[in-house]
């Protein structure tokens, strides 16, 4: 089985990402974010383990790819879980990708990415940091094993100062939980050097909703009807009503406009709100 795969193999009509590949050096994720979707399709999704024969498989896959699309690390895990500090699987994969001449997109919640700046600044690269809140108490409950938001913001600044384009994913937005932080997150991201914001609303699946019920019962009581009575269903996920999603995303878009950042939404079906050529920030990759 390939480890460097086509992104979005299900061809979801709501996915507007440009063509790219996806590589997950690890199966599962240690960050244990309550809202995470991977537990709906990865057994033991919060148990992080290295892929077997990873480097051999990456080398073989890279030789077979004939289109120089970006390689995204990672979409079903974080490429910088705590164990990466010792194992260095992502770092080795980056070396292999660089040797093969592919551009790369990093998607992470970890400041450990700054360890690899020596490699990344020599590659065609864009780094995307997910920041859902600036409140360390909320973050520690919502994303218990991820680095706190202040460390992520420092990493945004550090990566940006090396001349590497940085985007921030405000993802997910929760009504009644983190929505009051929208404007401040965008402002702080801009101050730290981010160039683009990708935003998305919380789209619970059965397992992630149950985790939220246990950790944030008041939030779930307030929003249950929004998701399950007047909201929409898309495959196994629940969506807020389109009018509320548009309202939240317009706030992000307006905040971006005020500080000079581009904006896009993710899997919302509202591409008309986007102000960037791509939804994922890969338009920021340097020309070869």
Per-segment meaning from a language model:
Residues 95-98, 121, 156-162, 253-257:
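Surface-exposed amphipathic alpha-helices with a cationic face
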Residues 71, 104-106, 127-129, 166-170, ...:
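Hydrophobic faces of well-ordered beta-strands that scaffold small-molecule active sites
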Residues 72-81, 111-114, 127-146, 173-175, ...:
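Conserved radical SAM core fold
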Residues 87-89, 150, 180-186:
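Charged helix-capping and loop-helix junction motifs
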Residues 5, 180-288:
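Auxiliary Fe-S-binding modules of radical SAM enzymes
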Residues 105-106, 174-184:
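Active-site glycine- and acidic-residue-rich loops that bind
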Residues 1-128, 132-137, 153:
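Conserved Radical SAM active-site core
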């Amino acid at each position: 089985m390939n480890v460097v795969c086509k992104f979005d193999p299900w061809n979801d009509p709501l996915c507007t990402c440009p063509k790219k590949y996806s590589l997950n050096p690890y199966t599962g994720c240690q960050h244990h974010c309550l809202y995470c979707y991977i537990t709906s399709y990865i057994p033991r999704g919060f148990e992080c383990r290295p892929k077997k024969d990873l480097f051999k498989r990456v080398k073989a896959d890279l030789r077979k790819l004939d289109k120089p699309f970006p390689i995204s690390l990672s979409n079903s895990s974080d490429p910088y879980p705590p164990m990466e500090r010792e194992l260095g699987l992502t770092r080795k994969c980056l070396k292999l990708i660089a040797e093969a001449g592919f551009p790369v997109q990093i998607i992470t919640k970890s400041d450990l990415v700054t360890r690899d700046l020596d490699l990344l600044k020599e590659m065609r690269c864009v780094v995307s940091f997910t920041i859902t809140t600036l409140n360390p108490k909320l973050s520690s409950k919502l994303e218990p094993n991820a680095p706190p938001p202040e460390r992520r913001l420092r990493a945004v600044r550090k990566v940006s100062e090396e001349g590497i384009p940085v985007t921030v994913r405000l993802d997910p937005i929760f009504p009644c939980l983190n929505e009051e932080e929208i404007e401040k997150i965008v402002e702080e991201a801009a101050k730290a050097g981010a160039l683009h914001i990708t935003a998305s609303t919380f789209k619970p699946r059965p397992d992630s909703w149950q985790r939220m019920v246990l950790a944030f019962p008041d939030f779930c009581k307030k929003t249950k009807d929004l998701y399950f009575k007047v909201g929409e269903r898309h495959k196994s996920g629940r969506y807020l009503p389109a009018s509320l999603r548009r309202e939240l995303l317009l706030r992000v878009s307006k905040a971006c406009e005020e500080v000079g950042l581009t904006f896009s939404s993710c899997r919302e079906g509202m591409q008309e709100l986007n102000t960037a050529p791509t939804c994922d920030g890969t338009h920021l990759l340097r020309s070869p």
